[in-house]
A protein has these predicted regions:
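A short, conserved structural fragment
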Residues: 41-51
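Short, cationic-aromatic polyanion-contact patches
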Residues: 1-3, 18, 51-69
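N-terminal glycine-rich phosphate-binding loop and ensuing alpha1 helix
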Residues: 62-129
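Short amphipathic alpha-helical interface segments
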Residues: 1-17, 24-25
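Conserved beta-loop-beta/alpha segment of the NTase-like Rossmann-fold superfamily
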Residues: 130-211
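Key DNA-contact positions within bacterial/archaeal DNA-binding proteins
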Residues: 31
Length: 231
């Protein structure tokens, strides 16, 4: 994860952002953010300006160039499965088309992606694929059919989309996630997997990290652990 690029992204998204807000966004200490800001100033990615008594950071052209390789090109939304855990709701409706607070989950995700400028969206379909066809006209998305949806898992669906993914920065999402806040960005400065922390025992899929914060192992069940959660 390029943390200097993350600093630049924070400033791009919120020009009046404080270092304290940046620390919260990046889940690191204020001191670490202060050090990263100094690095970015020294590299010429950002500059500091004053407005009266207040100081603020601005993103320079060199900082924008730093962000370019991290531009998100598109999103693949996995919507091929039957959704057995949602039975009987999914007998006639695919799980991604179920409503939460009066809004279909997959439509909310599409809108959130559009909000950050991501419009190249492919939906991988299988079960009741015809139910998703209205999204083509409504949101200008593409549908990719996986005929093996009933006998193979999500990895097989992702493999079907390999041409769409190859050489590109792409979100891989599940159709049945509902996020109150928009967690997507125009730029992603490294690969990541969404997770939540659980105190005490859990039977979820728990993640193990190495010293660089990269996922090194996944196990079912754990204690006081980060587990797979969300897109």
């Amino acid at each position: 994860m390029n943390r200097q690029a993350l600093v630049c992204r924070n400033i791009l998204e919120k020009p009046d952002i404080t270092q304290r807000e940046m620390a919260k966004n990046m889940d690191i200490s204020l001191g670490t953010v202060n050090g990263l800001v100094k690095e970015c100033l020294a590299e010429g990615y950002i500059a500091e300006e004053e407005n009266g008594k207040e100081k603020y950071l601005i993103l320079l052209e060199k900082g924008k160039e730093l962000l370019k390789p991290y531009k998100v090109d598109g999103a693949l939304i996995i919507a091929a499965g039957f959704g057995s855990r949602f039975v009987p709701l999914t007998f006639e409706t695919p799980k991604g088309l179920l409503e939460v607070f009066g809004e279909r989950m997959i439509e909310r995700q599409i809108k959130q992606l559009h909000e950050v400028g991501i419009h190249d969206i492919t939906i991988a379909v299988g079960y009741l694929k015809e139910k998703f066809e209205y999204l083509i006209d409504k949101y200008d998305v593409k549908l990719l059919y996986n005929p093996e949806y009933s006998c193979k898992n999500t990895l097989a669906t992702v493999y079907r989309a390999r041409k769409f993914l190859k050489g590109r920065n792409v979100y891989i999402l599940s159709s049945d996630n509902w996020m109150r806040e928009n967690m997507y960005h125009s730029y992603e400065c490294g690969a990541w997997y969404s997770a939540a922390h659980e105190e005490g025992e859990t039977k979820e899929w728990c993640l193990t990290f190495n010293k660089k914060g990269r996922i090194s192992d996944v196990n079912v069940g754990g204690k006081d652990a980060w587990f797979m959660y969300g897109p």
